[in-house]
Amino acid sequence: MRLLLIEDEPTLRESVAKKLRRSGYETDDCGDGEAALELLAAERYDLVLLDLNLPKVDGMTVLRTLRRTDLETPVLILSARSEISDKVEGLDAGANDYLAKPFHLAELEAR
């Protein structure tokens, strides 16, 4: 399974990517929305893990841009925003699931 992890916080991005790779997932990662859009335009992924608070292009814009051309690739939002309104906005924009930070890798893998 090929994943794209989009997370601006370097320590968290590296930690999650490392754990995913050890679990057998082929994982690309990037730290801003602009790089994410470039990767999404050039590559195919089985799952996108998307933070909302990103530099250059925010996560919600990345999601809406992806959904204009790709309705199939599952997107799981990983965000510190944990209000119900944030979750509803993300799901309404086309995310398949929403996981609030902090999270445990076992919870991520279960989804």
Where in this protein do the model-derived segments appear?
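N-terminal/domain-start alpha-helical segments
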Residues: 1-111
